[in-house]
Protein backbone atom coordinates (compact mmCIF):
# COMPACT_ATOMS: atom_id res chain seq x y z
CA UNK A 1 0.00 0.00 0.00
CA UNK A 2 1.36 3.38 -0.95
CA UNK A 3 -0.19 5.38 1.88
CA UNK A 4 1.99 5.71 5.00
CA UNK A 5 0.83 4.97 8.54
CA UNK A 6 0.61 8.59 9.67
CA UNK A 7 -0.97 9.61 6.38
CA UNK A 8 -3.50 6.85 6.95
CA UNK A 9 -4.41 8.36 10.32
CA UNK A 10 -5.01 11.76 8.73
CA UNK A 11 -6.95 10.28 5.82
CA UNK A 12 -9.14 8.20 8.14
CA UNK A 13 -9.83 11.09 10.51
CA UNK A 14 -10.83 13.24 7.53
CA UNK A 15 -13.13 10.48 6.29
CA UNK A 16 -14.79 10.17 9.69
CA UNK A 17 -15.18 13.95 9.90
CA UNK A 18 -16.68 14.19 6.40
CA UNK A 19 -19.23 11.48 7.25
CA UNK A 20 -20.21 12.88 10.64
CA UNK A 21 -19.76 16.61 11.19
CA UNK A 22 -20.57 17.32 7.53
CA UNK A 23 -23.54 14.92 7.56
CA UNK A 24 -25.04 15.62 10.94
CA UNK A 25 -28.31 13.70 10.57
CA UNK A 26 -26.42 10.57 9.54
CA UNK A 27 -24.05 11.02 12.48
CA UNK A 28 -26.92 11.32 14.94
CA UNK A 29 -28.73 8.32 13.47
CA UNK A 30 -25.60 6.19 13.47
CA UNK A 31 -24.80 7.22 17.05
CA UNK A 32 -28.29 6.26 18.23
CA UNK A 33 -28.23 2.76 16.71
CA UNK A 34 -24.62 2.32 17.87
CA UNK A 35 -25.70 2.39 21.51
CA UNK A 36 -29.08 0.63 21.28
CA UNK A 37 -28.93 -3.14 21.94
CA UNK A 38 -29.80 -5.27 18.91
CA UNK A 39 -29.87 -2.18 16.65
CA UNK A 40 -26.13 -2.02 17.25
CA UNK A 41 -25.77 -4.77 14.65
CA UNK A 42 -26.98 -2.25 12.06
CA UNK A 43 -24.19 0.15 13.04
CA UNK A 44 -21.64 -2.66 12.75
CA UNK A 45 -22.99 -3.51 9.29
CA UNK A 46 -22.67 0.13 8.23
CA UNK A 47 -19.05 0.20 9.42
CA UNK A 48 -18.48 -2.96 7.36
CA UNK A 49 -19.56 -1.06 4.24
CA UNK A 50 -16.52 1.18 4.73
CA UNK A 51 -14.26 -1.90 4.56
CA UNK A 52 -15.65 -2.43 1.06
CA UNK A 53 -15.12 1.20 0.08
CA UNK A 54 -18.85 1.96 0.14
CA UNK A 55 -20.71 4.94 1.54
CA UNK A 56 -21.52 4.45 5.27
CA UNK A 57 -25.21 5.25 4.87
CA UNK A 58 -28.46 3.56 5.89
CA UNK A 59 -29.27 2.14 2.45
CA UNK A 60 -29.91 -1.63 2.47
CA UNK A 61 -30.35 -1.42 6.25
CA UNK A 62 -31.69 -4.97 6.47
CA UNK A 63 -28.61 -6.38 4.76
CA UNK A 64 -26.31 -4.28 6.96
CA UNK A 65 -28.12 -5.52 10.08
CA UNK A 66 -27.69 -9.19 9.09
CA UNK A 67 -24.02 -8.71 8.24
CA UNK A 68 -23.43 -6.93 11.54
CA UNK A 69 -25.10 -9.80 13.39
CA UNK A 70 -23.04 -12.41 11.54
CA UNK A 71 -19.81 -10.53 12.28
CA UNK A 72 -20.77 -10.42 15.96
CA UNK A 73 -21.31 -14.20 15.91
CA UNK A 74 -17.92 -14.71 14.23
CA UNK A 75 -16.27 -12.58 16.92
CA UNK A 76 -17.95 -14.69 19.61
CA UNK A 77 -16.56 -17.86 18.02
CA UNK A 78 -13.07 -16.34 18.00
CA UNK A 79 -13.38 -15.36 21.66
CA UNK A 80 -14.86 -18.70 22.75
CA UNK A 81 -11.69 -20.83 22.76
CA UNK A 82 -9.40 -18.57 24.86
CA UNK A 83 -12.31 -17.81 27.21
CA UNK A 84 -12.96 -21.52 27.77
CA UNK A 85 -9.27 -22.17 28.45
CA UNK A 86 -9.08 -19.31 30.97
CA UNK A 87 -12.33 -20.35 32.69
CA UNK A 88 -11.26 -24.00 32.97
CA UNK A 89 -7.86 -22.93 34.30
CA UNK A 90 -9.57 -20.79 36.94
CA UNK A 91 -11.74 -23.74 37.97
CA UNK A 92 -8.69 -25.99 38.31
CA UNK A 93 -6.98 -23.39 40.50
CA UNK A 94 -8.94 -24.72 43.48
CA UNK A 95 -6.83 -27.88 43.34
CA UNK A 96 -3.27 -27.56 44.65
CA UNK A 97 -2.15 -30.60 42.65
CA UNK A 98 -3.14 -28.87 39.41
CA UNK A 99 -1.45 -25.55 40.19
CA UNK A 100 1.13 -25.81 37.38
CA UNK A 101 -1.53 -26.79 34.84
CA UNK A 102 -3.61 -23.82 35.95
CA UNK A 103 -0.77 -21.35 35.37
CA UNK A 104 0.06 -22.82 31.96
CA UNK A 105 -3.61 -22.78 31.00
CA UNK A 106 -3.99 -19.14 31.96
CA UNK A 107 -0.88 -18.16 30.01
CA UNK A 108 -1.99 -20.12 26.94
CA UNK A 109 -5.47 -18.60 27.14
CA UNK A 110 -4.18 -15.04 27.41
CA UNK A 111 -1.62 -15.46 24.61
CA UNK A 112 -4.25 -17.05 22.38
CA UNK A 113 -6.66 -14.21 23.14
CA UNK A 114 -4.03 -11.64 22.09
CA UNK A 115 -3.22 -13.52 18.87
CA UNK A 116 -6.87 -13.93 17.93
CA UNK A 117 -7.44 -10.27 18.78
CA UNK A 118 -4.87 -9.35 16.14
CA UNK A 119 -6.32 -11.79 13.62
CA UNK A 120 -9.82 -10.37 14.12
CA UNK A 121 -8.82 -7.16 12.35
CA UNK A 122 -8.05 -8.65 8.91
CA UNK A 123 -10.84 -11.17 9.57
CA UNK A 124 -13.37 -8.35 9.73
CA UNK A 125 -12.00 -6.78 6.55
CA UNK A 126 -12.09 -10.10 4.68
CA UNK A 127 -15.57 -10.91 5.99
CA UNK A 128 -16.92 -7.51 4.94
CA UNK A 129 -15.39 -7.57 1.46
CA UNK A 130 -16.43 -11.11 0.58
CA UNK A 131 -19.76 -10.78 2.42
CA UNK A 132 -19.53 -14.41 3.42
CA UNK A 133 -19.59 -15.91 6.91
CA UNK A 134 -17.05 -18.50 5.81
CA UNK A 135 -14.60 -15.70 4.98
CA UNK A 136 -14.29 -15.02 8.71
CA UNK A 137 -12.57 -18.40 9.04
CA UNK A 138 -10.60 -18.38 5.78
CA UNK A 139 -7.28 -18.38 7.61
CA UNK A 140 -5.21 -18.78 4.43
CA UNK A 141 -6.53 -15.46 3.14
CA UNK A 142 -6.43 -13.79 6.57
CA UNK A 143 -2.81 -14.73 7.24
CA UNK A 144 -2.01 -13.88 3.62
CA UNK A 145 -3.31 -10.36 4.22
CA UNK A 146 -1.01 -9.99 7.22
CA UNK A 147 1.91 -11.49 5.30
CA UNK A 148 1.41 -9.16 2.34
CA UNK A 149 1.35 -6.14 4.64
CA UNK A 150 4.21 -7.39 6.81
CA UNK A 151 3.86 -8.45 10.44
CA UNK A 152 6.01 -5.59 11.74
CA UNK A 153 3.99 -2.96 9.87
CA UNK A 154 0.75 -4.57 11.01
CA UNK A 155 1.82 -4.39 14.66
CA UNK A 156 3.01 -0.79 14.26
CA UNK A 157 -0.26 0.16 12.58
CA UNK A 158 -2.24 -1.45 15.39
CA UNK A 159 -0.19 0.32 18.06
CA UNK A 160 -0.63 3.65 16.26
CA UNK A 161 -4.38 3.05 16.08
CA UNK A 162 -4.54 2.30 19.81
CA UNK A 163 -2.50 5.43 20.56
CA UNK A 164 -4.83 7.64 18.50
CA UNK A 165 -7.95 6.20 20.15
CA UNK A 166 -6.37 6.51 23.61
CA UNK A 167 -5.42 10.15 23.01
CA UNK A 168 -8.87 10.96 21.65
CA UNK A 169 -10.52 9.24 24.63
CA UNK A 170 -8.54 11.42 27.04
CA UNK A 171 -9.66 14.58 25.24
CA UNK A 172 -13.28 13.41 25.10
CA UNK A 173 -13.08 12.45 28.78
CA UNK A 174 -12.27 16.06 29.65
CA UNK A 175 -15.51 17.19 28.01
CA UNK A 176 -17.59 14.43 29.63
CA UNK A 177 -17.74 16.41 32.88
CA UNK A 178 -19.78 19.14 31.17
CA UNK A 179 -23.49 18.58 31.90
CA UNK A 180 -25.59 17.57 28.88
CA UNK A 181 -22.94 18.65 26.38
CA UNK A 182 -20.55 16.02 27.72
CA UNK A 183 -23.18 13.29 27.37
CA UNK A 184 -23.93 14.30 23.78
CA UNK A 185 -20.24 14.33 22.87
CA UNK A 186 -19.76 10.87 24.40
CA UNK A 187 -22.71 9.54 22.40
CA UNK A 188 -21.36 10.92 19.13
CA UNK A 189 -17.81 9.78 19.87
CA UNK A 190 -18.50 6.05 19.48
CA UNK A 191 -19.78 6.21 15.92
CA UNK A 192 -16.99 8.61 14.92
CA UNK A 193 -14.41 6.10 16.20
CA UNK A 194 -16.19 3.29 14.38
CA UNK A 195 -15.94 5.12 11.06
CA UNK A 196 -12.32 6.08 11.73
CA UNK A 197 -11.36 2.48 12.55
CA UNK A 198 -13.16 1.05 9.52
CA UNK A 199 -11.48 3.50 7.13
CA UNK A 200 -8.09 3.07 8.83
CA UNK A 201 -8.06 -0.71 8.42
CA UNK A 202 -9.65 -0.51 4.97
CA UNK A 203 -6.69 1.61 3.86
CA UNK A 204 -4.23 -0.65 5.65
CA UNK A 205 -5.34 -3.78 3.81
CA UNK A 206 -6.23 -2.12 0.51
Show the residue positions of the predicted features.
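Selective recognition of hydrophobic, aromatic-rich stretches within alpha-helical transmembrane segments
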Residues: 31-52, 100-136, 170-206
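Short alpha-helical linear motifs
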Residues: 85-93, 163-167, 180-183
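Short, small/hydrophobic-residue-rich motifs at membrane-helix boundaries and re-entrant hairpins
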Residues: 9, 26-52, 62-63, 67-98, ...
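Interfacial aromatic "cap" segments that immediately flank transmembrane helices
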Residues: 3-33, 60-84, 119-169, 197-206
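Intrinsic N-terminal pre-sequences and regulatory tails
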Residues: 1-4, 92
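A cross-kingdom feature marking solvent-exposed beta-strand/loop segments within repeated
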Residues: 51-57, 144
Amino acid sequence: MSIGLFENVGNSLQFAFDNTAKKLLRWIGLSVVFYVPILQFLAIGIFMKVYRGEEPDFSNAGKSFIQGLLLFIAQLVYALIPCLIIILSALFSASESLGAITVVGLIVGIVLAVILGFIMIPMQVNFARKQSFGAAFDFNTIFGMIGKLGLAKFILAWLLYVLVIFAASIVIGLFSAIPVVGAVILMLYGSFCGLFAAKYFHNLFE
